[in-house]
Amino acid sequence: MALIEAPSELTMLKRYCDNDDIRIEANDVSAVQFLSERRQPFVVGAAINCYNPQTLKQFVDLGMTRWVMPVELSRDWLVNMLNGCDELGIRDRFEVEVTGYGYLPLAYSARCFTARSENRAKDDCELCCLKYPNGRLTESQEGQAVFVLNGIQTQSGSVPISLTIYRRCKGWWTWCG
């Protein structure tokens, strides 16, 4: 969950954090706080926008076991980030996840586009998003895919063609694609 603002969302987040049978991907710092207070391991999702090794170290110290790299950053940036983590002595304390395929998350909104399109309040949406498992496509006047609106998230209108794969090889991340 990103942009937690409604009381119902905070209640749901607390309920998820109280379940220690699953590992939570935190996409809002409030989830990091709840999980670290409970001493539960967690994943820092791409929506937290972590861009430097010092911040990663703080999250590792709070219980992070995996970090999802922000989708807008490059291979070279990732290599530099991981080298910085090696210098801080934390690289072996977490896994790295890289988004390689799918609609790219571009922005989050306080309003739920899906609920609004059906004239429903965000807190009383009756899970209308389940009718649209792939989101709602928006097109340009020329009929080209522009965005996919999926709940509170605006995503890219098409899936990038290239898929870049990284692997860990003798302590270094290398490009394999």
Q: What residues fall within each predicted segment?
A:
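Active-site pocket-lining/capping segments in soluble small-molecule metabolic enzymes
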Residues: 1-50, 54, 73-177
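Conserved functional loop/turn residues at catalytic and ligand-binding sites
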Residues: 63
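Conserved glycine-bearing catalytic or ligand-binding loops at nucleotide- and phosphate-handling centers
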Residues: 66
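Short beta-strand and adjacent tight-turn residues that come in two discontinuous sequence segments
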Residues: 69
